[in-house]
Amino acid sequence: MRFAIVVTGPAYGTQQASSAFQFAQALIVEGHELSSVFFYREGVYNANQLTSPASDEFDLVRGWQQLNAQHGVALNICVAAALRRGIVDETEAGRLGLASSNLQPGFTLSGLGALAEASLTCDRVVQF
């Protein structure tokens, strides 16, 4: 089966993103296709490259990045939600006159069209 995941919780502070990541790994292990993960609302914090968890905690931001690098899973970040929460790529930082960007490599700012496309092309969309 082909899956897409929607993550609405931050990397730390709630269980949503961690559960989504574990579910994503289980899908791949079981032979399913995970086409994309769409981060919406507070979920955009999963793409903040400035996140620095304690040394004894799992680094969820880098975990998502590895999922992208190893399995080609698209990591789409809602651009409107990201900008409201201070998550910007180099293009948006330049456009807004900001000193730097903080979007973790492997993630892509995108619109709700990416979520709509995933909904149309996947067998299942699971929200966390």
Curated annotation (Swiss-Prot):
The keyword Hydrolase does not apply. Its EC number is 2.8.1.-. The gene is tusD. The active site is at C78. GO terms for cellular component: sulfurtransferase complex. Heterohexamer, formed by a dimer of trimers. The hexameric TusBCD complex contains 2 copies each of TusB, TusC and TusD. The TusBCD complex interacts with TusE. This is Sulfurtransferase TusD. It comes from Escherichia coli O139:H28 (strain E24377A / ETEC). Keywords: Cytoplasm, Transferase, tRNA processing.
